[in-house]
Each structure stands twice: as C-alpha cells, then as structure tokens.
Amino acid sequence: MKIWLLQASEPMPISNCNDRLWRMGMIAEELKKRNHDIVWFSNTFDHLKKQQLYNKDTIVNVTDNYSIYLIHAMGYKRNISVSRIINHKVIAKKFSRIAKKLDKPDLIYASFPTIDYAEEAIKYGKRNNVPVIIDIRDLWPDIFKHNLSKPLALIASPYINIMNYKTKKIMRQAFAINSISEAMLEWGLKKGNREKSKYDQYFYIGYDSNNRNIVETKEMNSIDKDKFNLSFFATINNQFDYEKIIELAKLLEKDKDIVINICGDGPQFAELKEKVKDVSNIKLLGWKEKEELNYILQNSKLGLAPYKNTFDFQMSVSNKFAEYISYGLPVILFSEGYMEKLLEDNECGIASQDTSKLCDFILDVKNDKQKYEAMSKNAQDLYQENFVAEKIYKNLVDYLEKIKEEVEKWNMH
C-alpha cells in the first residue's frame, strides 16, 4: 500500500528532532513494519520548540520505503497568530503543487488541524479518486471563538466563518473520519452533516511505554526521589490554568514533602516564572528531553493535567493523560468531560476545579498507601486496556489496510 500522511506539527524520526514520536509518528512506524510505502508531509518549522529544522524544502529518507517531505514556510512565535496562519497556508499550497508531481497514493491520512492541509488533501483525493481519511485532533475553528477575547473574536469572525465553512466541507467530503475520542468523532460527523458509517471510527492516542531510556544528569538533582512529586510537562502556553496550580500549591505548602514539578518552555514561561518565584513547593525545570522526562515521571506519584475547563478539552483525551497512566500515575485533572469520566469510571484520579477538593484528595492518597497503590494499579490497568500504542496503531493500520482492500474491490466492479 502506498500512503501519504499529512501532519505538520509532530516530532519526526530525524536526526535533529530528538523528541518521542506522537500519533502520526507511531502510525508511520507500524506502516513501516508492514513494508508499506510511506510519504509523510510535514513542516520544516518545529512547532514545539519554535525553531526551523531546515531552511528549505527537504526530503529525509528514513528507510527505503519511508520518506518525510518537510515543506519550508515561515515560523511563528505564538500558536494563535497571523504568522501561524501564513505558515499553514504556505505549506498547504506547496503540498498541492508537490503532490501533482508524485505518483498517486492508495490512501491519504490527514490530521485535522491544520484546516488548510486537510482541505488540500480532500481536493487532491477528489481529483484523483483517492480515499482521504481525516483524523480529528483538535476542534478548529470552534476553539478560536472560545480562546479569543470578545473584541478579538469579533475582528477574527470573518476568518473564523471561512474556516468553519471549509471544515464543514472537509468533514462532509472525507471518505472517513477518525478522531481521538468518541465525542470528537461526533463533533466531526455533525460538522459534516453526515451519518456515521462503519469507516468513521475513533482511536485513542496511544502511548509507547517501551524503550524508556533514563538519563540522570546534574539537573536531576532538583528532583528529590524521596518527595511526593506531582509532575506536569507541556509547552507553557495559554491552554493551562496556572493560577489554579499556584492556588493548589499554596494549599499544599503545609506538607513539606509535596512538590509540584513543571517541565517545559513556551510563550508564557517568563510570566509563569515570575508568578511562582515565591511559591516554595513549585519547581520550574524548563524544557526536558524524553530521557529526562522518563526519569522525572518514574519518580513522580501523581500526574498533573491542569487544562482550562474549555469545551475542546472536555471532549478530548490528551497525550499527557495516556502518558501519566502508563507510569501508573493517578491523574489530577482540572477540566470536566471525557477524561473526567475515564478517571471516575476507573478510579484512578480526580477531576475538579475546586482546589480545596484537589488538595484533600492529594493529602488523602499521600497518607493512605493502600488507596494510592490501588489507584496506581487502576491507572496502569486503564492504560493496558485502552492506551497501549502498539495495540492502538496495529488496529488503526489494520483498518487502513481494510479500506484499501475494499476500495480496490469497488473499483474492480
């Protein structure tokens, strides 16, 4: 099977990108194992680190049957910005031109967002009779209405309306819709005004718990393995409720054994650093590579998921959620919705916006070893049952192979 993958912002298996692979990277690895021909269209701009990996269009051959086509476009500093819009439009248009020169694939698997990339995939699929599967990762453009202030939302409304029109068309014309949760799949079907078919399915974000290399560096001295560590890692941006983290930390200060470790960098790092400078039990550790994160998580007791209680996180299941439970870490969640239900149904954490309630829970599991161990086991069981990357992406590639076979049969008739 010849397949094109479209994903512009995830880590890739290339020499100058040392982060662990996410969803598209793991799908590509499973396809590679089965000797399928893969072209992954991505972006020369590293979305996580906000830096250019290459200064021109570049093809990286991972293996003989697996290539990554990095399309060059200008970078951006903020996730919601005009520069990012331009980046998305440029790589989408360049993809359209590049695609015309290549042998057509059997399938296209395109992440959503970006809207522009997905739109060009749909156009190509229609012109060339290639099935396009759209994989919903985030609820664009609806999230813009919620994340922008009222004046900015009003100014941006013409652009948002255009993007909403494009999104409806993408969801309507896709051969199939995938997503990372059932709720997000329903959102996509509603956008496309379509009935659910057997090909419209959701696959959770899988986390690969194998190959957990650990690097102990001098910096790791800041992690006290004997403390009751709550850990959180992310790009430090406006998706998270830092005020609540600080509020929770102050409530926990009375217990000197509890430490909140925050790993990451981003546009709001300097502001956060200033806010927590006098909070004794919060440690800002900066950006960490995957080996260092492994060390931190293996020496943590709880995983902190301080998402703002917005509709998109209420419908989603995050990378962080899967990673925390893979380590057997009960999760402290700030948002309601889909992840909240998973925690409640499986008794492996708490979801609340009430910091007093969160504080009581943390102190309770810290002081009740039996309760903590039961929750930790429940977290690992939930991971093994629903979030093991090898199982999820094996099933997903089985699904793609089945689509290819069935489409071939239709074309023969």
Q: What are these regions, as identified by a protein language model?
A:
Residues 42, 141, 156-216, 283:
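Donor nucleotide-sugar binding/catalytic pocket of nucleotide-sugar-dependent glycosyltransferases
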Residues 270-295:
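Nucleotide-activated donor-binding/catalytic signature segment of Leloir-type glycosyltransferases, i.e.
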Residues 345-356, 364-370:
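Conserved acidic donor-binding segment of nucleotide-sugar-dependent glycosyltransferases
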Residues 8, 14, 73-85, 103, ...:
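Acceptor-binding helix/loop patch of EC 2.4 sugar-transfer enzymes
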Residues 295, 356, 369-401:
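A charged, aromatic-enriched C-terminal amphipathic alpha-helix characteristic of glycosyltransferases
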Residues 207-209, 221-240, 245-250, 261, ...:
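Conserved donor-binding/catalytic core segment of Leloir-type glycosyltransferases
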Residues 1-60, 176, 247-253, 412-413:
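N-terminal subdomain of nucleotide-sugar transferases
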Residues 240, 289-296, 303-326, 332-341:
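Nucleotide-sugar-dependent
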